[in-house]
Amino acid sequence: MANITTQGYHDEVTFPMIVRGTPPATLRGVLTLSTCSNVCLLTDYPFSVTPTVQNADFAHDYARAMGKIPLRSGLTDSLDVGYRPGELVVTATRAAGWSSPGLYLDTIDDVDFAKPRLRVEGDRLQATVPVTDSWGEKAPDLRNKSLTLVLADGAIAQEST
């Protein structure tokens, strides 16, 4: 299908878990993810994890996994989001500059976000995102709608609403 843009993770995903209380002998569940090529489909992945005794590497491994969760602050010095019909504009500054920026947007009902166009000028990142309705036609009105986004630069990410 033409004009479909997908975003997300590639090659590796980490899901840190905290089990409170006495852990079961085996933790089982089903993880449902959308997998995409030309079309996105929901796929169920049954899993089974046998809890192990914490070894010397546990604290390091746990801290590493938790470090991959987007922060609430700390990546950007300032963040501004604006909207004009058909276009979302995200502007962020970062004193350390931008080396490998990325922008990921949560979905909003009946709104499609196209692939962001990123432009870096020194410590300033500007992302322009074309916006259409679910049919790829008219631009919806995003005023007064809540939007959650993740800005990333390399291994550091920040989630903002």
What are these regions (language model features)?
Residues 1-161:
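Extracellular/lumen-exposed scaffold segments
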